[in-house]
C-alpha cells in the first residue's frame, strides 16, 4: 500500500531548503545600506584608478581549453567513486565504466582533430 506520509521528511527538507535562501536574500535586501554615489559606481582595479578601456575581448581558445578541462574534471568526479568501490561492484559496472571512458576518449580525439587543443 502506497502511503503519502512516507514522503513527509522529503517535503519538509524541500520547504526548508527553499525557504533558507529566499529568507537570506530578503533579509540582506532589508538590512543592506543603500549608499549610491560616484565612488560606489566607479570600477576598482587593485587599489588604483582604472586607465584605458575596460572592455577586453578574450580569445576563443581560452574558452575551448576551459571547456575541455571541465569535461575531464567531470570525468574524474564520476570515476573516483567507481574506483573506490571497484572490488564490490562487479564486472557489469566495470563494463559500464569502460564504455564511459571510451566515449570520453572518442570526444577527446574529436576535439583534437578539430584543433580545439592546439594553440595557434
Curated annotation (Swiss-Prot):
Gene3D superfamilies xrefs: NADH:ubiquinone/plastoquinone oxidoreductase, chain 3
Gene Ontology BP, a term: photosynthesis, light reaction
Transmembrane stretches, start-end: 9-29, 64-84, 88-108
Entry GO CC: chloroplast thylakoid membrane; NADH dehydrogenase complex
Catalytically driven reaction(s): a plastoquinone + NADH + (n+1) H(+)(in) = a plastoquinol + NAD(+) + n H(+)(out); a plastoquinone + NADPH + (n+1) H(+)(in) = a plastoquinol + NADP(+) + n H(+)(out)
InterPro entries to which the protein is assigned, alphabetical: NAD(P)H_OxRDtase_bac/plastid, NADH_UbQ/plastoQ_OxRdtase_su3, NDAH_ubi_oxred_su3_sf
Membrane association type: Multi-pass membrane protein
EC number(s) on file: 7.1.1.-
UniProt keyword list: Chloroplast, Membrane, NAD, NADP, Plastid, Plastoquinone, Quinone, Thylakoid, Translocase, Transmembrane, Transmembrane helix, Transport
GO molecular function: NADH dehydrogenase (ubiquinone) activity; quinone binding
Pfam families, per the entry: Oxidored_q4
Taxonomic superkingdom: Eukaryota
Location relative to the cell: Plastid, Chloroplast thylakoid membrane
Classification via HAMAP family: NDH1_NuoA
Purpose: NDH shuttles electrons from NAD(P)H:plastoquinone, via FMN and iron-sulfur (Fe-S) centers, to quinones in the photosynthetic chain and possibly in a chloroplast respiratory chain. The immediate electron acceptor for the enzyme in this species is believed to be plastoquinone. Couples the redox reaction to proton translocation, and thus conserves the redox energy in a proton gradient.
Subunit structure: NDH is composed of at least 16 different subunits, 5 of which are encoded in the nucleus.
Family: Belongs to the complex I subunit 3 family.
Name of the protein in question: NAD(P)H-quinone oxidoreductase subunit 3, chloroplastic
Organism: Carica papaya (Papaya)
Amino acid at each position: 500500500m502506497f502511503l503519502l506520509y512516507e514522503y513527509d521528511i522529503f517535503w519538509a527538507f524541500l520547504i526548508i531548503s527553499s525557504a533558507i535562501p529566499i529568507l537570506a536574500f530578503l533579509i540582506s535586501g532589508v538590512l543592506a545600506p543603500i549608499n549610491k554615489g560616484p565612488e560606489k559606481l566607479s570600477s576598482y582595479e587593485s587599489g588604483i584608478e582604472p586607465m584605458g578601456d575596460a572592455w577586453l575581448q578574450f580569445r576563443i581558445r581560452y574558452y575551448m581549453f576551459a571547456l575541455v578541462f571541465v569535461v575531464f574534471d567531470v570525468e574524474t568526479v564520476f570515476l573516483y567513486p567507481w574506483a573506490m568501490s571497484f572490488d564490490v561492484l562487479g564486472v557489469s559496472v566495470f563494463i559500464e565504466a569502460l564504455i564511459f571512458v571510451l566515449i570520453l576518449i572518442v570526444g577527446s580525439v574529436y576535439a583534437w582533430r578539430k584543433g580545439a587543443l592546439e594553440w595557434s
